[in-house]
Amino acid sequence: MEKIASFTIDHTKLKRGVYVSRQDKVAGNVITTFDLRLKEPNNEPALDGAASHTIEHIGATFLRNHKTWADRTIYFGPMGCQTGFYLILAGDWKAKDIVPLMQEMFAYVAQFTGTIPGESAVECGNFRFMDLIQAKEEAGKYFTEVLDNIAEKNLSYPS
């Protein structure tokens, strides 16, 4: 089998950031998959599963209700390695194009109060697996240390 595109990225050089992971054509339309890397692979502890699950619920709800991006949002969810999230948007986008959206979303998660969207047995298959406090900490850290004044090195995969 051929190696998938994400395995061709040198994860020993990968920093936290916002990256275009791939672009595909579906029925003649471009979709862009983004790598939202919250943790430096193999150098930082991975995201806590419950925190990641909470960010997924709040982030997906935010995106699907966003006045500009709702109709372009296809998917938002955690990476299996627990170092970040994938965001799939309809359209031909560059990483810098979505930085304002990511700043808005991660600030929203960091300041979130109230009931976590989908936090019930009826709405989620593992609704007790949530940690709002840690989710807010991780979102705030990503916003402050990466998204706010993001550098070019955090927008392009290492060569």
UniProtKB/Swiss-Prot annotation:
An example Gene Ontology molecular-function term: S-ribosylhomocysteine lyase activity
What does this protein's record comment on cofactor binding?
A: Binds 1 Fe cation per subunit.
Q: Which GO terms describe its biological process?
A: quorum sensing
- State the disulfide connectivity: none
Keywords, comma-separated and alphabetical:
Autoinducer synthesis, Iron, Lyase, Metal-binding, Quorum sensing
Task: Give the UniProt family note.
Answer: Belongs to the LuxS family.
Q: Any idea what this protein is called?
A: S-ribosylhomocysteine lyase
Q: What species is this protein from?
A: Desulfotalea psychrophila (strain LSv54 / DSM 12343)
